[in-house]
Regions:
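Glycine-rich P-loop/Walker A and Walker A-like loops and their local beta1-loop-alpha1 context
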Residues: 2-42, 46-48
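Residue-level preference for the first positions of well-ordered beta-strands
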Residues: 17-21, 114-115, 145-147
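N-terminal phosphate/diphosphate-binding loop that engages ATP/GTP or pyrophosphate donors
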Residues: 31, 35-84
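Phosphate-binding/switch loop-helix module in NTP-utilizing enzymes
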Residues: 85-116, 125-127, 131-133, 137
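Walker B catalytic acidic pair
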Residues: 120
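Substrate-engagement module of ASCE P-loop NTPases
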Residues: 135-152
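Glycine-rich, charge-decorated loop segments at or immediately adjacent to ligand/cofactor-binding or catalytic sites
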Residues: 151-166
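A charged, well-structured terminal subsegment
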Residues: 171-197
Length: 197
């Protein structure tokens, strides 16, 4: 599947690319990148919408609880169901994901953010037409750039959804180039940090 996604990679560093999708092989690395971007964007005065995933370990459990932190309000929404330590399969709480997605979409429509950051485009968006899909559409309608993670398995669906407005990238350097093209007043450093000029 990664080979299919690699065929979708393209350079994002021009203003016409509204969605920069980071190919996620390792969830923690992508989350860390998004946290750094969000922190630097806020420190430079940019208004943000979207959500970042926070995983909280549970004592005595193999799997953590999953939360989304709304970037506009700071609200923390638990998106995983507690199905017991031995449960297998998806633990995502669809109702909680819908609640988070609606909160994000409202922020996009009412607060005119400068940047939307979403932790991932996954099964809910690709196969079910739900999740944060409407929030992405709202951002595109308002010409607000979107930074999002995507697993190789869902990269073709994201590309089908966003078309030529989407660039799928595999490294942090490409994200920095995209951010530099969208927010020219920023100098994006090699370490993945941003400093306002």
């Amino acid at each position: 599947m990664r080979a299919i996604a690699d065929g979708l990679l393209r350079e994002p560093a021009h203003v016409g690319v509204a969605v920069c999708a980071v190919l996620r092989d390792e969830t923690r690395a992508a989350n860390d990148l998004f946290v750094r971007v969000a922190e630097r964007a806020k420190s430079a005065g940019l208004r943000l919408a979207g959500a970042l995933q926070q995983d909280e370990p549970r004592p005595g459990r193999r799997r953590c609880d999953m939360f989304l932190r709304d970037l506009a309000s700071g609200r923390l929404i638990r998106i995983s169901e507690d199905r017991g330590d031995l449960a297998q399969g998806c633990r995502l709480d669809p109702g909680a994901l819908t609640e988070a997605a609606e909160l994000i979409e409202r922020a996009i429509r009412s607060a005119s953010p400068d940047l939307v950051i979403l932790n991932k485009f996954a099964k809910a968006e690709a196969e079910e037409g739900g999740g944060v899909r409407d929030a992405i559409a709202a951002a595109l309608e308002a010409d607000i750039p979107v930074l999002i993670g995507v697993a190789a398995a869902y990269a073709p669906a994201l590309r089908d959804f966003a078309g030529d407005l989407c660039a799928i990238v595999a490294d942090e350097a490409a994200v920095r180039r995209w951010l530099g093209a969208r927010f020219g007043e920023w100098e994006w450093l090699a370490e993945g940090e941003a400093v306002a000029r």
